[in-house]
Amino acid sequence: MSKKRKKRSPCPVACSLDLLGDKWTLIVIRDLYLGRSRFTELATAPESPPTNILTERLNRLLESKMVRQIPANDGTKHRAYELTEKGRALRPVLEALRDWGLKWIPNTQTLLGKVI
């Protein structure tokens, strides 16, 4: 069931943070960029959220049309996830966060490499 979230303001920064600003959503999007596409791959990634939170974040990303479900590419009836155009449009945001972290947070290293 879809919950209609009330906007706290018309500010695009506030609205974007309402959708993306929790602890896990951008990590899930990053992992999709890194090629993880199935729930089990996302759930076993080094920085994965608990599975109940992963399910909730994926549902929110599906609802907001940043991610879509597709058939798994292994011929099974399992489903996979991929970023939509809207989700891929977050690439510069992830790159900016990566670059900022590399510059200002000691002992960080990129997982994204040339992927984004």
Predicted segment positions?
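Short beta-strand "wing" residues that participate in macromolecule-binding interfaces
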Residues: 69
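Glycine-centered, phosphate/nucleic-acid-interacting loop/turn motifs that mediate DNA/RNA or nucleotide
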Residues: 24, 65-66
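Amphipathic alpha-helical dimerization/coiled-coil segments
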Residues: 91-116
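Basic amphipathic alpha-helical segments that dock to polyanions
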Residues: 54-64
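Basic, amphipathic "hinge/linker" alpha-helix immediately C-terminal to the N-terminal HTH DNA-binding motif
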Residues: 21, 73-96
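N-terminal helix-turn-helix DNA-binding core of bacterial DNA-binding proteins
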Residues: 11-53, 82
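A detector for short, charged/polar N-terminal pre-domain segments
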Residues: 1-9
